[in-house]
Amino acid sequence: MSNTPYNSSVPSIASMTQSSVSRSPNMHTATTPGANTSSNSPPLHMSSDSSKIKRKRNRIPLSCTICRKRKVKCDKLRPHCQQCTKTGVAHLCHYMEQTWAEEAEKELLKDNELKKLRERVKSLEKTLSKVHSSPSSNSLKSYNTPESSNLFMGNDEHTTLVNANTGSASSASHMHQQQQQQQQQEQQQDFSRSANANANSSSLSISNKYDNDELDLTKDFDLLHIKSNGTIHLGATHWLSIMKGDPYLKLLWGHIFAMREKLNEWYYQKNSYSKLKSSKCPINHAQAPPSAATRKCPVDHSAFSSGMVAPKEETPLPRKCPVDHTMFSSGMIPPREDTSSQKRCPVDHTMYSAGMMPPKDETPSPFSTKAMIDHNKHTMNPPQSKCPVDHRNYMKEYPSDMANSSSNPASRCPIDHSSMKNTAALPASTHNTIPHHQPQSGSHARSHPAQSRKHDSYMTESEVLATLCEMLPPKRVIALFIEKFFKHLYPAIPILDEQNFKNHMNQMLSLSSMNPTVNNFGMSMPSSSTLENQPITQINLPKLSDSCNLGILIIILRLTWLSIPSNSCEVDLGEESGSFLVPNESSNMSASALTSMAKEESLLLKHETPVEALELCQKYLIKFDELSNISNNNVNLTTVQFAIFYNFYMKSASNDLTTLTNTNNTGMANPGHDSESHQILLSNITQMAFSCGLHRDPDNFPQLNATIPATSQDVSNNGSKKANPSTNPTLNNNMSAATTNSSSRSGSADSRSGSNPVNKKENQVSIERFKHTWRKIWYYIVSMDVNQSLSLGSPRLLRNLRDFSDTKLPSASRIDYVRDIKELIIVKNFTLFFQIDLCIIAVLNHILNVSLARSVRKFELDSLINLLKNLTYGTENVNDVVGSLINKGLLPTSEGGSVDSNNDEIYGLPKLPDILNHGQHNQNLYADGRNTSSSDIDKKLDLPHESTTRALFFSKHMTIRMLLYLLNYILFTHYEPMGSEDPGTNILAKEYAQEALNFAMDGYRNCMIFFNNIRNTNSLFDYMNVILSYPCLDIGHRSLQFIVCLILRAKCGPLTGMRESSIITNGTSSGFNSSVEDEDVKVKQESSDELKKDDFMKDVNLDSGDSLAEILMSRMLLFQKLTKQLSKKYNYAIRMNKSTGFFVSLLDTPSKKSDSKSGGSSFMLGNWKHPKVSNMSGFLAGDKDQLQKCPVYQDALGFVSPTGANEGSAPMQGMSLQGSTARMGGTQLPPIRSYKPITYTSSNLRRMNETGEAEAKRRRFNDGYIDNNSNNDIPRGISPKPSNGLSSVQPLLSSFSMNQLNGGTIPTVPSLTNITSQMGALPSLDRITTNQINLPDPSRDEAFDNSIKQMTPMTSAFMNANTTIPSSTLNGNMNMNGAGTANTDTSANGSALSTLTSPQGSDLASNSATQYKPDLEDFLMQNSNFNGLMINPSSLVEVVGGYNDPNNLGRNDAVDFLPVDNVEIDGLVDFYRADFPIWE
């Protein structure tokens, strides 16, 4: 609607109305839009009958829709009448468009467009003047690049407009004057700064100074997950981008992965021979002694000893079954043909992973006729997922079984291959099965008779329909489910026409036999309780598209049942729950109405539609998997609707994916919401929409006017329509205004010829509703494309929308909403949500588009931040925000901004506090601040969809604020490393960090608010628990990642090692200063007391000092508690719980109380036992080839520019550099600039110095372990061979100046010796993995060979300084980690582990002059310090061993939170050992 008053056009409207009274009836047929019929004058001699017909013409009402609905007088004021303003529904005041006023409307639109273009010209001139006045010449050059040309001039039409409206001479003179004024101002500012500038002026100059800084977002935040069968790209907006791009997390991952390699190698070498010694035959000979010569043991021990227990490197050939099947006929085991149940391998393969020792109580008898194989727990050939049965021999011995395999696929092999496929998805080192999680409900335990049917064989259409009749609920329950969907869930996916859909359901299922009653909105409400249990006996599919309608119905039944508030997950966060409660909805419903609603929900809970019903429908009726291989004849509008519903269902009810589809091969039990299958499905939906022509507005096709009344929504369906003579047209009278279309569909020639005016009017309504559905589907697909791009970080499919699409918004449909107010709200939401999508598109263009992201400027990101803040805080209307984006060149008009020229300004995004507190005082969502009287409350219209619409507004706020958090984080990580080189950037980094933290905490709070209110009665989130659960939890998880980054900064200090002290809070020496420990415990106790009073609803200040880490840790613990409870219902919560538990275990501060229990040097181990490989997380348990494909692993080991030589190179200056710091490859990421984090405070330095003194005391006891041999100036633990492992601290070599190195003392680098003392303890990643699987790695060798040649002089000087530092100069400021000097003697009460030496350490010792054998305990102590962060060794072992608390989730899951591919899954054997290159 245009906001321009219509007072000036009132006379013309009246005259046009009077002149149109006596028009010919022939001119009232459907005409093309904009046709001028005023020149056609009817004859004066017309009969009275014709005049009566003329009075029944389709007249457009002049009153607004709301006043007509309320049946009150409307004053017809534009844009909003007084009645709607008084009752608080001005945002819904809607006038139907007059067809004869379209020409005048076009003139008004032209004036508005010219006005907006003039404003844009002014904005562009201001931007150009700012650019030309910039003191930096480089920035001027950058603005002349082709990528930035469209930023200022837009497209060609706007360039022409600039030339037409502004003279070139005046413009040049004006810009010249502005440029001179700007230069004078800059000179004055320089003079004032040189004299004595105050803080405000310096802050302003800093802001102006860095406005034209360029950021390259194509490197740090792009991920490429290299799988064995391909690659997956994940962009900057993906949830893993922070995991990969943050500098602290990169170093942490390097530290963790190196620890993982060491522990994995140690444990592997330790147990490889013990398994061989403890191996026993799986046959219990005590029960069946092989006494006779022919009764020998059926186990082929030669194959057993060579293939089943030996390490991987000794079994290059596929493993075969150890059972000699030729012995079955000798009497040991009865012949297979005697008993059908014996056609299985008699060996329990679960014993293979336990050292071939079967449990005594579970040892099967060889004479047993029971099948004893358990393929759910083990596969015969894990690396290749190969069946252990020799099919060649099996085919010869049992040809009959193989001959019948076509009819019964299960008879091909006695092994259940389905369970093997599930097991094959595990890592190579694990033998656990992927558990089949229980569905989101607990009622899947009940079994339909149809569910026990095997659907492997082909089923006819009649069999499928008969099975579906058994699965579907009774008729009355189906009608209740449909009403619940359209009342609560429909605004989330409004692509259906409610009236038409109910009409189809009546025809297909005969729901109209239930004598429904009609409520105020024209919706059928079943009222007969006697027919409650009337089942579905027949499903009629008269048209081909009805199969898709049936599939949509099944999805609606399933989604609505899952969304019932009683089915939502119970969340109990203890005392903190009260902080996240919001007022309940104030309801005007009576007690009887509430009781009736409760009864309806209890009835619906009893009838769950199984997910197998959808599988049958989409596989046998719709054949959805074959649509991509069939011509467009199978695609119609209903097919597109089903595909959208199917995509929506997969994302919302992800727990059903394990049952519904097996197409995902990501190696995880749950593919998650960032699965590539969703991405491919959306591309198919987009192409189907193009095939149907949805990208063109339906008004462009006049033939639709003659086609739609005959075929309704199946206009593109070329199939023949089945006859259905039993269909009664009168059954649809209560369903819709277009119900009489069914009579015209029977082939009435009179209705199609237009002789019946009633039918003509209803046909016209049907046409408009069809066009309306057309537009809704298209813009919903556009919204899906934007949301997927935001979630995955992938480019949008529908870019520059207006270049190929002219489809109008649904608000352009000429529909009378007086009988369907719900649809009016849907139309308003479509316009608003599309405008919000335009704001998101502007951000995505600058982050994901390579042409812009490679050289995006700071002031552009600042403009995006300011505009998004204005939108979410309600200080600026969404129309103004979109207009500002276009005027500033941040959003091209080709994206669709010009289509919103006639939008209603009052219908905008309400403020978030108004959304949450709406139910407290019964205030309207869009109230203008005035007090509402009781009479106004009585007059207020009871609006449907209000709570659901506000829940959607809530999700939009979360999305916008997540973008604000991401933009601030990008700018923060860009300017934080520049602090040492340019101190002016410290202020910017601090501001961006605080803003990022504020928006991260906002997302965290909103996530908690949602899950704490989903089960409340009359809550804001009624029936939205399934739809909004993942978006809310995902935003909370993203916020937690920034919390982890800040905790690392708060605890670690500067990355370069400046002013940090390598201390271990709990040492092995008795000389350790216990007062420091007591102070740490006291500080921790005080901080815990403060946390009890912590208000989770308040923002966190970065200046909180020492308590910052504790405050943020408390939020992590609460989120972990939340995900632990949600993981029982939602599979995607398991991954987030693992991620949170991982960091909680890692970052937990060690305490004296917990460490002193074990005492002595074994304090760190406690009751810890060596972690089993099967308990490791996937990204820690994988081998080298798997980890190399993980983007996080790639950047973790390549982040700090490595230097060194390969294993065959000679030592340099008496020592060799480790592999992680030995290669200076050109493809590596640039080094980190020396900087200190914004959370680093003076109090941190004070505590570090105090604990450094205590460390100096410990240092005296360990000086003797340095070998000061003149030929080998190598500290203890340094290997002459290089290693790829990262040390616990990796300071940047280039950050130290030559003056510090040549001075002989380095007082500010206390952790310098960590580089030398800890590198040797970390093993070579390549050596470890090579010893395990014997894979050559020539790429690594070449990198080693070229690394020394690329070493910089600074690196050589730095390492020379290391080798010449005498032990006497080591003091409190420059000391060795206690781990690096741990003694080799075992403690008096040490565990058995302390007597074990690392095999890698033995290898190092045999080739080292120091002859040192570090044990595992020394290694753990050595790596307990990560850049000043004191990691509890017990927590470190727990993390590296995998966060797998049996009391946490109640089961062992293979779901991981890092994308580590698995070589065991099916179809990847060809890529195994393919030496895939590592790409950036």
Curated annotation (Swiss-Prot):
Domain of life, source organism: Eukaryota
Entry's Gene Ontology BP terms: DNA-templated transcription
GO CC field: nucleus
DNA-binding annotation, residue ranges on this chain: 64-93
Binding positions for Zn(2+) 2 per the UniProt entry: 64, 81, 84, 93
Keywords, comma-separated and alphabetical: Activator, Coiled coil, DNA-binding, Heme, Iron, Metal-binding, Nucleus, Repeat, Transcription, Transcription regulation, Zinc
Any single Pfam family the record assigns to this protein: Zn_clus
Cell location: Nucleus
Comp. bias (Polar residues): 1-50, 143-152, 160-176, 429-444, 703-731, 1385-1408
UniProt GO MF annotations: DNA-binding transcription activator activity, RNA polymerase II-specific; RNA polymerase II cis-regulatory region sequence-specific DNA binding; zinc ion binding
HRM repeat windows: 280-285, 296-301, 320-325, 344-349, 386-391, 412-417, 1189-1194
Region span, Heme-responsive: 244-441
Low complexity composition bias: residue spans: 130-142, 177-208, 732-756
Region listing for Disordered, in residue ranges: 1-56, 126-208, 429-456, 703-764, 1381-1408
Gene3D superfamilies for the chain: 1.20.5.170, Zn(2)-C6 fungal-type DNA-binding domain
Signal peptide boundaries: none
Keyword Nucleus in annotation: yes
Parts forming coiled coils: 105-134
Positions with a binding annotation for Zn(2+) 1: 64, 67, 74, 81
Entry-linked InterPro entries: bZIP_sf (IPR046347), Fungal_TF_Env_Response (IPR051430), Transcription_factor_dom_fun (IPR007219), Zn2-C6_fun-type_DNA-bd_sf (IPR036864), Zn2Cys6_DnaBD (IPR001138)
Residue stretches spanning the membrane: none
Assembly mode: Binds DNA as a homodimer. Interacts with SRO9 and YDJ1. In the absence of heme, binds to at least four cellular proteins, including YDJ1 and SRO9, forming a high-molecular-weight complex (HMC) which results in repression of its activity and dictates its DNA-binding specificity.
Note: Heme is an effector molecule for CYP1/HAP1. The HRM repeat region mediates heme induction by masking the DNA-binding domain in the absence of inducer.
Protein role: Regulation of oxygen dependent gene expression. It modulates the expression of Iso-1 (CYP1) and Iso-2 (CYP3) cytochrome c. In response to heme, promotes transcription of genes encoding functions required for respiration, controlling oxidative damage and repression of anaerobic genes. Binds to the sequence 5'-CGGNNNTNNCGG-3'. Is non-functional in terms of iso-1 cytochrome c expression in strain S288c and its derivatives.
Protein name per Swiss-Prot or TrEMBL: Heme-responsive zinc finger transcription factor HAP1
Record organism: Saccharomyces cerevisiae (strain Kyokai no. 7 / NBRC 101557)
